[in-house]
Amino acid sequence: TMKLDYIYHSGFAIEADGITVIIDYYKDSSEEAPDRGIVHDHLLKKPGTLYVLSSHFHPDHFNRDILSWKEQRSDIRYIFSKDILKHRRATAEDAVYINKGDVYEDENIRIEAFGSTDVGISFLIDLQGVRLFHAGDLNNWHWSEESTPQEIRKAEGDFLAEIKNLQQKAPRVDIAMF
């Protein structure tokens, strides 16, 4: 069985048999305290391999606190967008870094990096027969009241180009997180 948990903002967790994946952790689900909520109260204590993915360096998608989780978990694997390293939010030893087009694969999971219309990457995840897509900051970014018609057309074209690329390489996606 597999369970999808919404954490906060763009943060999600996937709970599968013996595997947990946390994506774009910004803060935990509880408003009471920063170290309370589904991540600290449940997911970090759950047995099995823990994967932590971050799509880019913006603080609402990457919280450096996640690097301290390795003190509690010897079975943690970090997979980050290369812009996190470039912007010195983490060191080369902290994670495996991937760019658009790169694939991370081990005995449990396959993660392919797709593009973004902002910075960083989006993730296509194959896990226990389920294909999931996490968009990161891939979006049709424009604001009607601020953007010119030309900016709106460009934003929409960029977004649709990334979606078309995803569709060509992965015609089936079971769960999408935007």
Protein language model features and the residues they cover:
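N-terminal pre-catalytic "stem/leader" segment of glycosyltransferase-like enzymes
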Residues: 2-16
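Conserved acidic residues
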Residues: 49-51, 76, 174-177
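Short strand-connecting beta-turns/loops that link adjacent beta-strands
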Residues: 9, 17-19, 118, 128-129
